[in-house]
Amino acid sequence: MSTLQNTLGYTEAAATALYGEYTFGMTLFVLPPSFIYPVTVSLVPDIADALARGDRAAAGRSTAAALKLTTLVALPAGAGLSVLAGPILHLLYPAVPETAEAAAYHLTFLGLACIFVCLMVATNGVLQAYGKEYIPVFTLLCGGVLKIVTNYLMVGDPATNVRGAPVSTLYCYVLIVVLNLIAIARCVPERPAYIHLFAKPLLITAVMAIAARSSYGVLVRCLPERWAVLPAILIAVVVYGVLALALGAVTRADVIGLPKGEKIAEILHLR
């Protein structure tokens, strides 16, 4: 807010209003990562245990499972928030439609950023399990520096002002994840093949995002604008789930290490 007031000359009321738009988006930004922590907590100890036994092959499988499950959860959650940012905010904040509309811009970028927050959590856990605790500290420092610099430049630009904040947040976490993945590739002998790991989830998520946005565009013609987003989300979930199972993006080995993993695998008929 100080940048908005001191550099751009906004009044305190105007700066507060702009910052309020950003915080609307931040409220939903923190939700997807909260679902990733249980995945990391359940799988990372498996990596450490396998390494303690000297079973590097098992450690490699657990590493791949941790990253894959994180990707399978984070991609649809973040992409969904991004492509349906406006409708979701209008549903949650009907009393302030103008603010919800303005906040949609922020959530569009923050939705993408939360994908990388989730991947940061998982990759940090993997590096710590391999005894590379200093690397997440270094990459977080690099991301923090980039965030500060880009935030100062973009928020201080009258053309972008507070709209630069979510973009700088996205830059920050993208850098952290890229550096973490490079570190895993160099430090982990049994590193997973990244193309194999990310290709199917990315493809499925792209189709899901198109389905979500397209179905909302159709539903809003026959339902109240505020409520049309709910069936659109349901359609997106179904599309993603069906494609993930049909294309083999989720296997029994991926979920077996989760709490109730055996039961989940049986329910989904995973092999």
What are these regions (language model features)?
Residues L112-C142, Y152-L153:
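Membrane-interface junctions at transmembrane-helix termini in multi-pass inner-membrane proteins
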Residues A15-I36, K68-L72:
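Alpha-helical transmembrane segments of polytopic membrane transporters and translocases
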Residues S214-R271:
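Membrane-proximal transmembrane or re-entrant/amphipathic helices at the cytosolic face
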Residues S34-R53:
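Helix-loop junctions and terminal segments of transmembrane helices
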Residues Y134, C142-I182, P192, I210, ...:
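Membrane-interface helix-loop junctions in multi-pass transport and translocation proteins
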Residues S62-L92, V162-V188, P201-L202:
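Short alpha-helical transmembrane segments in multi-pass integral membrane proteins
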Residues T16, S82-C114:
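Interfacial segments at transmembrane-helix termini and the short loops linking adjacent helices
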Residues M1-F24, D49, L89-E98:
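Helix-terminus/linker motif at the lipid-water interface of multi-pass membrane proteins
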